Amino acid sequence: MADEDCQNLTVDDIVALIDEAYKTLYNNRAICPTMATTLTFMAKTNEGMLLAHLGDSRIYQIRKGEGVVFQTKDHSLVNDLLDSGAIKPEEAKNHPQGNVITKCLFVTDDKDRYMAPTITLIRDIKPRDVFMLCTDGVYGLVSNDDMVEILTSDNALEERTKELVALCRNSHDNNTAYIIEIGGVDDDSTDKKENVTYTIGKPRRPIKRRICDFVRETLRFVKQNKHLE
């Protein structure tokens, strides 16, 4: 997908992308009919960073001097229990069902079963902000304090990545991450902009060919490029 296409992405486009991912899983069901996966997505648009996620893989936004300024909220049973008041925060830390997720991509051809992602537009972006998309095998081993210290250091991004690799070396879980550092922003005002979270329905409209091509290229890229493993 060309840069100008990403810049014009809309929330509906993201929903269409995820619908296409569901179709891709279904079309490859012969490989593993029970396969499922979490999802994180990020694209730089004219309005800011457009993020989407399903499950407990996370997106962090980290800023030097401020630490973690944004973090996605896991789609998990524990978070549902917290939100309902059924458990207290201290009970959530070591909850026996801490690894149970409530949303994911999975094999189905029933569009009514597609799970809606959480989509957030990050408008508060500063130069040198670091975004990290990662699985629970990373954040389960690396504390927020260590994450902030490493990713906001003055070392080259490659060196910071190697430091994270070292911390995840003994993980028995999937520990994949993609790290992006913001070089500059179009609007350098000091005014804080509010982020926007969207409530997603299930619009059904023809998906643009460029979006389909982008999904295929993304899946091919993920297969060929693995970080922090």
How would you name each of these model-derived features?
Residues 1-229:
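PP2C/PPM-type serine/threonine phosphatase catalytic domain
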